[in-house]
Swiss-Prot record:
Primary localization: nucleus
Gene, per the UniProt record: h1-0-b
Name listed for the protein in its UniProt record: Histone H1.0-B
Xref: InterPro entries: H1/H5 (IPR005819), Histone_H1/H5_H15 (IPR005818), WH-like_DNA-bd_sf (IPR036388), WH_DNA-bd_sf (IPR036390)
Keyword Lipid metabolism listed: no
Lineage, uppermost ranks: Eukaryota, Metazoa, Chordata, Craniata, Vertebrata
Length: 196
């Protein structure tokens, strides 16, 4: 019983020492960025070279390789690192800041090419739009002509109605005036005969 109790306290300090060793080094992301900066290779630094640099300069545990892979993937997704070759944690990597300084010189060339290409595409589009615009006014003119033809048609009908209405009272007035004139003519010879 005494031997077992003496063995257990001896095991506890070993675990505490292992925890202390893991806290001696900075974050894996910081160590990876430092390794890439130290190499300064044009093609980018590989994962194996990053691991060697970290193991040589920092006190790292046995599970350092797996944690380096995870931290590399996180840095790539966040944009701190850019992968020049390979997929995932394998391949070569560069710092994103170094690439941003080089890329602006290349971007203006691409923008000039893009500015030239739309001009060529724009010419056929304008030609295609112009006949469509020319066709639309023709349709509008046809509609105006049809409307103009329909409008004069009702106007003569109205004129005919007004003429027929005016003609009827004129005829009636002539007939009425003619009737009283006849008896006056008959009465005049009678008066002349009496005087003689």
């Amino acid at each position: 019983m005494a031997e077992n109790s003496a063995a257990t306290p001896a095991a506890k300090p070993k675990r505490s020492k292992a925890l202390k060793k893991s806290t001696d080094h900075p974050k894996y992301s910081d160590m990876i960025l430092a390794a890439v900066q130290a190499e300064k290779s044009r093609s980018g630094s590989s994962r194996q070279s990053i691991q060697k640099y970290i193991k040589n300069h920092y006190k790292v545990g046995e599970n350092a390789d797996s944690q380096i892979k995870l931290s590399i993937k996180r840095l790539v997704t966040s944009g701190a690192l850019k992968q020049t070759k390979g997929v995932g944690a394998s391949g070569s990597f560069r710092l994103a800041k170094a690439d941003e300084g080089k890329k602006p010189a290349k971007k203006p060339k691409k923008e000039i090419k893009k500015a030239v290409s739309p001009k060529k595409v724009a010419k056929p589009k304008k030609a295609a739009k112009s006949p469509a615009k020319a066709k639309k006014p023709k349709v509008a003119e046809k509609k105006v002509k049809k409307v103009a033809k329909k409008k004069p048609a009702p106007s003569p009908k109205k004129a005919k109605k007004t003429k027929t209405v005016k003609a009827k009272p004129v005829r009636a007035s002539k007939v009425k005036k003619a009737k009283p004139s006849k008896p006056k003519a008959k009465a005049s010879p009678k008066k002349s005969g009496r005087k003689k």
